[in-house]
A protein has these predicted regions:
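Structural/interface elements that position substrates and couple domains in central-metabolism enzymes
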Residues: 1-324
């Protein structure tokens, strides 16, 4: 079993900061790294720069106890968690420059035995690409793509699966998918997350872990889009969509979601494009223009000319602010 005393979290947004604070609350020494000087200063004062229930209390306690400290420059640690944005460039192409920058930033402080984890939602192959960038910057160390199980540095992907507004609870309670580039990488990553995760830590390979997160969010995207289109159709046909869905869901194998203002959040509306980019020739259904307009560009009932704001919108998830 791998022992960890210190963790560096690269990117202190809506995933990185809660993750850093949660590790710190379990007694690890945590170094949070971010290029945003304001975020760094705010955290070091025991405050938070994003809105997330309970996060302020966890951060304040961790900083007060000396377990969490923020900086703009990476420092040595036993494990590194990369939680930076993965936006799109023109043409719906994933932009991995933040991952590349993070890799080059941590490379100088890596030492034999360290673990590097990519948490950012990424196209398939991004973890391997991150490992390649690290290897290029540190030719004196061996990495999984060349040395396999015997590599000096272990590399894995562990996608976040939390709901904004419930991040602190779900970080601890949700199952985690652990995808290492080798079995040794997976085991080391599982040992790290077991420090605070009460859910199951399920081991697989890096590519499967990457695809798992994309599949989860794409599945939700499709189902939300279906519910929203039903709402528009029912409005045309003078049918109560809520009653319709309630009755249809009495079928034991049907579970239609409720219509709403469309797909939101940081991931669900864009993750299908990661799948398309990873296998454009094979992702014919998801990449088909008409289908893409429906599920990927899903604007929900707001695109409907007769969209109406109803009290049911109050049932939406609480509003939260922040970047990954």
């Amino acid at each position: 079993m791998t022992k960890f005393e210190s963790v560096a979290v690269i990117g202190l947004g809506y995933i990185g900061l809660p993750t850093a604070a949660t590790f710190a609350s379990r007694g690890l020494t945590v170094i949070g790294v971010d290029v945003n000087q304001h975020a760094v200063d705010t955290i070091n004062q025991g405050n938070v720069h994003i809105v997330e229930p309970e996060l302020d209390m966890v951060v304040r306690s961790a900083v007060t106890l000396g377990k969490l400290r923020a900086t703009t420059t990476p420092e040595p640690a036993d494990a590194f968690i990369v939680a930076v944005p993965t936006p799109f460039m023109d043409g719906k192409k994933p932009d991995l420059r933040y991952i590349e920058s993070a890799s080059k930033a941590i490379a100088p402080v890596l030492k034999k035995g360290d673990l590097v984890i990519l948490e950012s939602t990424s196209p398939v192959g991004a973890t391997e690409q991150m490992s390649a960038w690290l290897a290029e910057a540190r030719p004196d160390l061996s990495f999984p793509q060349a040395a396999g199980e015997c590599s000096d540095i272990r590399v894995a992907h562990c996608p976040e699966r939390v709901l904004p507004g419930q991040v602190i609870r779900e970080l601890v309670e949700n199952d985690r998918i652990i995808g290492g580039m080798t079995s040794a990488c997976s085991e080391a990553a599982r040992d790290l997350y077991r420090i605070f995760v009460k859910g199951d830590c399920i081991v697989t390979d890096a590519r499967t872990a990457e695809m798992c997160k994309l599949t989860e969010n794409s599945f939700r995207d499709v189902n939300i889009a279906f519910a929203n289109e039903l709402s528009i159709i029912c409005d045309k046909l003078n049918i109560n969509v809520w009653e319709l869905i309630r009755l249809a869901n009495r079928h034991p194998r049907v579970n239609i979601l409720q219509p709403g203002p469309g797909v939101g959040g940081h991931c669900i509306a864009v993750d299908p494009w990661f799948i398309v980019d990873s296998a454009p020739d094979q992702a014919k259904l998801i990449g088909f223009d008409g289908f893409a307009d429906l599920i990927i560009g899903n604007g929900g009932v707001w695109r409907h000319g007769r969209a109406r704001l109803e009290c049911r919108l109050l049932r939406l998830a609480p509003r939260v602010v922040g970047l990954r």
